[in-house]
């Protein structure tokens, strides 16, 4: 599952981890110091790069599309089944991560678990804080069940069971 390696403002996702070394006075210090809030989140190259809601809900849409269609993909061997499980786990992890980012910034957010028909009316409302947290935890639990604890060096950067449990712990 492909997702951009930076947020909508051009700040790399690695800035959110403890594996980054802060060298400049640029936007990364907001992340490395743990000072991200809805008041200072739009830091980066330019506010014109996009908005937070669009960026994360676009990622949520992609994960929902995958989760709705993954069962249509045939799996005839044990390797195929294992690969499908890993891809499904990655989708649950990414959806949890995207919701966690929105939850951290805005609290009550709409929870969307399906794709929309182009002619459908938008009727989603913001969920309660506990409902959002429970949703993130549920996706993290699903991801942790499906993801491996590590990958080969060729798959560096993919979501692991530990990453899913870390997002769960932060929620």
Predicted segments, located by residue:
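Amphipathic alpha-helical protein-interaction segments enriched in hydrophobic
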Residues: 157-167
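Conserved, well-structured interaction surfaces
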Residues: 26-106, 121-123, 127-132, 140-156
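TPR/Sel1-like alpha-solenoid repeat signature
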Residues: 92, 165-171
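An N-terminal domain-start capping segment
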Residues: 5-9, 120-125
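Short edge-strand/loop segments of extracellular domains
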Residues: 115-118
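Proline-centered turn/helix-capping motifs that create local helix->coil transitions or kinks
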Residues: 5-7, 102-111
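Acidic, glycine-rich segments characteristic of secretory precursors and extracytoplasmic regions
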Residues: 1-22, 39, 82, 87, ...
